Amino acid sequence: MADVRYYGTGRRKHSVARVHLVAGDGKVVVNGRDISEYFGHETLIMMAKSPLVLTETEGKYDVIVNVNGGGYTGQAGAIRHGVSRALLQADPEFRPSLKEKGFLTRDARMKERKKYGLKAARRAPQFSKR
C-alpha cells in the first residue's frame, strides 16, 4: 500500500513552497536539508512549524518542502502557508483554528515598486532650499 501524501502550495512575497505531508515522526526537510540547517534563526523555524504546533500534529507527520524564490522570511511564510493547506487536506476539522490564526490567508503584501523621480518607492531626493 502506498503511503498517503497530503499536498499544499504556500506563497509569500516572491517565495513559493510546495509542501508534502507524509505520516512519520516529525522530520522537516527543506530543499533536501534539515530545517534547522536551512534556516539559521529559531524565529523562522518556529514560524514555519507554527501550524503543526497549533494543530498538535508536530510528531505525526514528516514535512517535505521544496521552496524557491524570495528571501528567508518570505520562504518561512510560504512554508507556513503550504503546511496549513496540507494539514487542511489531512483533516478539515483544523480549519477553524488555522483560520483564526490567519495561516490560511495568503499574505498579499508585496514590495512597493520604485517610482521615477524618486530614489526608492517613497524616498525622495534630498531637498535643498537654496
Swiss-Prot record:
Annotated PROSITE patterns: RIBOSOMAL_S9
SUPFAM superfamilies: Ribosomal protein S5 domain 2-like
One Pfam family of this chain: Ribosomal_S9
UniProt entry keywords in alphabetical sequence: Ribonucleoprotein, Ribosomal protein
Cysteines joined through disulfide linkages: none
CC terms in the record's Gene Ontology section: cytosolic small ribosomal subunit
One GO MF term: RNA binding
InterPro entries the record matches: Ribosomal_Su5_D2-typ_SF, Ribosomal_uS9, Ribosomal_uS9_bac/plastid, Ribosomal_uS9_CS, Ribsml_uS5_D2-typ_fold_subgr
Superkingdom of this protein's organism: Bacteria
GO terms classed as biological process: translation
Family statement: Belongs to the universal ribosomal protein uS9 family.
PANTHER family for this protein: RIBOSOMAL PROTEIN S9, SMALL RIBOSOMAL SUBUNIT PROTEIN US9M
Name recorded for this polypeptide: Small ribosomal subunit protein uS9
Organism: Exiguobacterium sp. (strain ATCC BAA-1283 / AT1b)
Source taxonomy: Bacteria, Bacillati, Bacillota, Bacilli, Bacillales
Gene: rpsI
